[in-house]
Amino acid sequence: MESGVRILSLLILLHNSLASESEESRLIKHLFTSYDQKARPSKGLDDVVPVTLKLTLTNLIDLNEKEETLTTNVWVQIAWNDDRLVWNVTDYGGIGFVPVPHDIMWLPDIVLENNIDGNFEVAYYANVLVYNTGYIYWLPPAIFRSTCNIEITYFPFDWQNCSLVFRSKTYSANEIDLQLVTDDETGLPFDQVDIDREAFTENGEWAIMHRPARKILNPKYSKEDLRYQEIVFNLIIQRKPLFYIINIIVPCVLISFLVVLVYFLPAKAGGQKCTVSISVLLAQTVFLFLIAQMVPETSLSVPLIGKYLMFVMFVSTLIVLSCVIVLNVSLRSPSTHNLSTKVKHMLLEVLPQFLHLRVEPCDEGEETPRERRRSSLGIMLKAEEYVLKKPRSELMFERQRERHGMRREPDGYRADGFDVGVTTTLYRNLAQCAPEIKDCVDACNFITQNTKEQNRTGSEMENWILIGKVLDVLCFWVALPLFVLGTLAIFLMGHFNTAPEHPF
């Protein structure tokens, strides 16, 4: 009994499906028996067929700045009315709409005008829905690669305005009227790109700020021209700069800051200073090359990060130049340059006070630590002179009597055992009688004068080294504010470059 009921139920379902299929087939046969897909759905030649468009964005795939190409995944909704495709629902089993293949229908030939790959049509030709009232609804999906003029002035803090331009490639404004779809809630044209919230995938690099849509009539063309009317869908997108900040800007700023630290090296280490500065300069050149690979090859504008790299390269070049000058100053000597009093006063007295730098210049009349070390030579020479003038026997038995408790010399005697007057007379007689001793005295005087000259030369060379140190500090306090203020000024321009509040 149960098996019979099941068989009966299956037969009823099969009959209903066959009846429904036959009704749909009969309807399609009825509609398209005398249908001419090449003819416009208009009653007269002068009638204009309204065609509505709507764009639904499901994914902003990519914006290639180098190729100036926008890749999007969209659904293109196209609708119009065809009075030839009208039927009574009750005559065909209550069928209110029927899907039909696109190749047997009249289509308005709406294409993406600003495509980049020569593919003007959609990616997949879906079936067309035909309603009993003559309303035609077509929703084909597409992956469009369209052109987008890239403005790189504020890269990577930029925003772009990319557009998708649709027009008919067959019919002029006298034959079809392109319109935006009407919003069911407001009754006004839906003047923006729709976003499918369930299927939409957020892009990791770009944020959609505005998505307006509008119809544009080009008055410089006539209505017979296909370029007279077009529907433009705009995508105003703002770049998310975090990737570029972490991977390009921060390393570039840190490496560029190293060039300022060369002033902490000794003034005489000019070779190391130039090596560090030129190394940083080469690193900045590498960053500039990386930026050139990301942006389009255009001479209309320079990207913001490119401006910054040019700025720090200019500062680095100035620092290398200053290091060369400081090295030249630090290695000067009295034989090549004369240190004037005005220069010494300005660079070793006035300028250090302005820089809050403690500098003690070396004067010729003052005895520096180096001079004190050199003066020991004179003491040794005097000691040798004293030893040479005394007989060895006197040196051996000097103060012998005092050690054995005998009387001391009178107050008129010096500690070395000679009477002052007798010693003077003895020296005078020795000078007259011994030319060799006079030559020794002259040699000692020559050594003394030479030592003083060396001390004067050394003092002046130390002053040149101090001047180099002062110039290093001065250049540091000039380069550091220049670097910091230039960095802030350039990147703040990009920070305040945001998409407009209103698209138009």
UniProtKB/Swiss-Prot annotation:
Signal peptide annotation: 1-19
GO CC terms, sorted: acetylcholine-gated channel complex; neuron projection; plasma membrane; postsynaptic membrane; synapse
Main localization (coarse): membrane
Record has Ribonucleoprotein as a keyword: no
Pfam families tied to this protein: Neur_chan_LBD, Neur_chan_memb
Keywords: Cell membrane, Disulfide bond, Glycoprotein, Ion channel, Ion transport, Ligand-gated ion channel, Membrane, Postsynaptic cell membrane, Receptor, Signal, Synapse, Transmembrane, Transmembrane helix, Transport
Record InterPro entries: Neur_chan_lig-bd, Neur_chan_lig-bd_sf, Neur_channel, Neuro-gated_channel_TM_sf, Neuro_actylchol_rec, Neurotrans-gated_channel_TM, Neurotransmitter_ion_chnl_CS, Nicotinic_acetylcholine_rcpt
Name used for this protein in its record: Acetylcholine receptor subunit epsilon
Organism: Xenopus laevis (African clawed frog)
Encoding gene per record: chrne
